[in-house]
Amino acid sequence: MISAERFLDEAFKLGFSTYTGVPCSFLKPLINASIESDKLSYIPAVNEGDAVGIAAGVYLGGGLPVVMFQNSGLGNAVNPFTSLIQTFEIPILMIATLRGDPNSHPDEPQHRLMGKITTQLLDLMEVSWSWFPEDEDDMKKTMELIKDRIIDSKKPHVLVMKKGSVEPYELSEQLESKFVNGLITNDYECDESEMVTRIEFMEKIIEKTNQNHDLIIATTGYSGRELYAASDRKNQFYMVGSMGCAIDIG
């Protein structure tokens, strides 16, 4: 086993400071340690696809993200991973636990099939993967691999975590819920007396936004195409596929 803090510290040295994901008992030590760390951020996600979208937003904002979830949710992540992460060549580190490991003790029945096909599914997705480190020697090799794959080659990589890889880590105190303050909203009024077309609405948004300060994310389909046709600016991101993940990127 390795300590959660040790892994997080080594990853932090490479630049990984934002973690997002969906809970799994295997991941509890990493999640708890990242929550309590003064230098790391943990963003909970409601599902695995949203976690991948959040990670994409972190990278586009200048950070290096780590996505963590149970392999049972890998299917939820396939769409944004193949259509967003790989299409836009976003280098994220993903940690997927191996519930239903066919070479370990029997797990709950719902994990049986995914446990058998997790690594095969990653191969089909054409993403590189390796086992999550279980000792110090593995740790060094893993960090070297992450540096080569993600930092230097700008490619995503997945660590598949087996049960018992990380030592337990309990929260030192119960955390209070935090509310986001200072949210800025703007109401854009349309002077037109009749309904406007989508591209006319896009033009209104472009007119009201500053490309040096505002980010415009267009979801997949005609929205992105018409935004591009109206005005192609450096603050505009045209998402393809990954239905539902535009809000996560933002």
Segments from the language model and where they lie:
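Thiamine diphosphate
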Residues: 1-152, 157-250
